[in-house]
């Protein structure tokens, strides 16, 4: 069993994360250099925050044992951790999360409308054998700019607005390399902990094809800047397990 909120500080190079967010959210020109300072208690758990130019950032803080709180007020930013998880041995990821208020109306498939109050992201190392021609063509430039450890594909589990549970959506920023799976929406219960357990290996096969061998990063985000809305979200007890 691998617990995400273990008390281990990590500090990966910023250009790896820059490459990651090229896929995950904004164009690379919007990324601020380096890591932002976040709540010391969260930082001690090994998380780093990524901010974006001209965008207000969220506030991340510890909210108990193995719990992260994110307050988002017309803002967007993410916290991330580097991981080395053998996905063939520990293919399940479980966590609990909750929201304070309903998500503002948004559209995950449209740039500038794709807010989501809470999301969990998983990234995977680049896999040349199963990469598309466009991914292979782009790879040398990414590695030249951000290093060989820049991730290949991104899978995110999203608390959406009106999208149906289970719907798979291609990121308007990451394209075919970033797929979003809706887990909760504006009809989900508020103010109570809701449990999730996902088979990352099966989900990857369904949306990308092929089999990843490992996970390289995990992230938590909140995005309310397009809708100029406010929300408070919580995520706790994240862990990878074989069953």
Q: Where are the model-predicted features located?
A:
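Short carbohydrate-recognition loop motifs
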Residues: 59-77
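Extracellular beta-strand elements of beta-rich domains used
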Residues: 218, 238-240
